[in-house]
Amino acid sequence: MLRIGQGFDVHQLTEGRPLIIGGVTIPYEKGLLGHSDADVLLHTVADACLGAIAEGDIGRHFPDTDPEFKDADSFQLLQHVWALVKEKGYTLVNIDCTIMAQKPKMAPYIQPMCEKIAEALEADVTQVNVKATTTEKLGFTGRGEGIASQATVLLQKK
């Protein structure tokens, strides 16, 4: 049996925080605001995986009202989600992700992001695709106010 999941997330850019996307720290004058490390891409991947196994979303599993998850490492959260996927008997077929950001340019960081996601999902890097786009200076991402991400995952029953 195949299961498809979709994830979407948005975080506001703010000064005084590191910019971590896809488990990769990107040099930039702003970072993403959030209760955890605010890794918009890994949150999207986690939500897609949870959706595919009908387990809600990351807000249900890691509520921002719980101090345990303050400044949490999203890579570890994704590993926890992947353990749930495996418990339900699924394995990764592939995942396709898109980052929407006007700045900074993501191209130099795409391959390391793919590698981190593959590591968390215990998959081959060829099963992971990450791409980035601008929004042609339109909307909150185009104005540099935040970064958005979406992902679609395909899982297969072992």
Curated annotation (Swiss-Prot):
Pfam families (UniProt xref): YgbB (PF02542)
Sites where the protein binds a divalent metal cation: D9, H11, H43
Cofactor note: Binds 1 divalent metal cation per subunit.
Pathway recorded for this protein: Isoprenoid biosynthesis; isopentenyl diphosphate biosynthesis via DXP pathway; isopentenyl diphosphate from 1-deoxy-D-xylulose 5-phosphate: step 4/6
Keywords: Isoprene biosynthesis, Lyase, Metal-binding
Catalytic activity: 4-CDP-2-C-methyl-D-erythritol 2-phosphate = 2-C-methyl-D-erythritol 2,4-cyclic diphosphate + CMP
Cofactor: a divalent metal cation
Protein's GO biological process: isopentenyl diphosphate biosynthetic process, methylerythritol 4-phosphate pathway; terpenoid biosynthetic process
Site (Transition state stabilizer): residue numbering on this chain: H35, T134
Enzyme class label: lyase
CDD domains the UniProt entry points to: MECDP_synthase
Residues at which 4-CDP-2-C-methyl-D-erythritol 2-phosphate binds: 9-11, 35-36, 57-59, 62-66, 101-107, 133-136, 140, 143
Entries under SUPFAM superfamilies matching the protein: IpsF-like (SSF69765)
UniProt EC number: 4.6.1.12
One Gene Ontology molecular-function label: metal ion binding
Subunit structure: Homotrimer.
Protein family membership: Belongs to the IspF family.
Chain's role: Involved in the biosynthesis of isopentenyl diphosphate (IPP) and dimethylallyl diphosphate (DMAPP), two major building blocks of isoprenoid compounds. Catalyzes the conversion of 4-diphosphocytidyl-2-C-methyl-D-erythritol 2-phosphate (CDP-ME2P) to 2-C-methyl-D-erythritol 2,4-cyclodiphosphate (ME-CPP) with a corresponding release of cytidine 5-monophosphate (CMP).
PANTHER family in alphabetical order: 2-C-METHYL-D-ERYTHRITOL 2,4-CYCLODIPHOSPHATE SYNTHASE, CHLOROPLASTIC
Annotated protein name in UniProt: 2-C-methyl-D-erythritol 2,4-cyclodiphosphate synthase
Organism from which the protein derives: Bacillus pumilus (strain SAFR-032)
Lineage of producing organism: Bacteria, Bacillati, Bacillota, Bacilli, Bacillales
